[in-house]
Amino acid sequence: MVSVADATAPSGAIVVEDLHKRFGKLEVLKGVSLQAQQGDVISIIGSSGSGKSTLLRCINLLEIPNDGRVWVNRELIRMRKLRSGEAEPEDSKQVDRIRASLGMVFQSFNLWSHMTVLENVIEAPVHVLKVPRKLAIERALALLDKVGIADKRDHYPSHLSGGQQQRAAIARALAMQPKVMLFDEPTSALDPELVGEVLRVIRQLAEEGNTMLLVTHEMRFAREVSSKVIFLHQGRTEEEGTPAEVFDNPRSERIRQFLKAQH
């Protein structure tokens, strides 16, 4: 992959500066900033509607921010303003390159239903990265073994449990060898008894030093795996710090109320 890092860019795997996002007249993000260094695991917490998922979707350009700047691996995503006040990316090839470097795992799995688990995992490496099919299969089988579903390689998603589908989705994201993993509430659509198997995989990825941004309602898990926790409230960063700072010594009343409601 071509490296186009800017020597003057702020250091970090992901840097977000003063990000704003509006849907019509509703401003969902009101100037959010964050910085993730290589190997950081940042959990983004907050009530529903606080802007957590929108923030992740703006980072990989599934949503286009209205204002602010985003650097991925020290490469600034170039945007241009439209007369309408909206913005759009300047370079579609840059968007493709940025997205290929970010692994995204959604709460709803988003597996292709007409493909087997193995076919889901090799699809993007073969067609986007142009990895030889034999090598892509080899890597995919190793990833399916890593997430504990190697025996499901020839199954279709509809034949898997929710936890197995989400682990397949994680393997699919990892198959692109991303620089950063983005998890958007990866356990919220799962039955309670299946949550643990997905969290174990994410914990392993954290322990291996992967850079990750994790939107989650699993407070105990966030405390255990995160290097940093960010609490969003009504589209703004209300609190930010280490897990000990945020969970044990929160400064704002809003996060105290939020954490109390989680028990």
Name what the model sees in each region.
Residues 2-12:
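Extreme N-terminus of proteins, especially the signal/transit-peptide cleavage junction
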Residues 11-243:
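ABC family nucleotide-binding domain
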Residues 2, 231-234, 244-263:
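C-terminal boundary and immediately downstream tail of ABC-type ATPase nucleotide-binding domains
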